[in-house]
Amino acid sequence: MKKFLIFLLAVLALTFVACGKDKDIESYLDMERINSEFNIEKQDKEQIKFTDKDESRSVYRIFNFQKMKNVDFKNPKKIDKLEEFYLGKNCEIIYKDESTIIVLVLAQDNSYAYNIQTFDDSKTELMMAVSIGSDKELSEDELFNLLDEAKSFLK
């Protein structure tokens, strides 16, 4: 059930993302680290999705990185649109600023599902998403640590 929920979260995380055009996505990421620590589920020139090798972890993570078109990335309302989308799905917004949104998607029977989405233009226009399934409620600090971990994959 947890794995299905996480897959669903990963699909939701990519709902508003469009592809960009220049270098391959892997040129912006620490692929050696990703290959050694995670299972790559999907990879092409525009996006990569990788998951924890240990599927029985108490906090299971799916990371998605996707290049965006400049016009979509520059949209000042992209976070507001994500917020509206999540609120329409009865999710709880934990944190939101101009480039990041952290959402509690599901809390049921000691299972928690979170989505973290952020946008980064330090190398190219990227959307980074972390979908998390956990058997315990995560603190805001723990969620920000997962956001920092996602950012640590950037070269």
Where does each model-flagged region fall?
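Signature of long, low-cysteine stretches enriched in small and polar/charged residues
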Residues: 84-121
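A short acidic-to-branched-hydrophobic micro-motif
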Residues: 49-77, 127-133
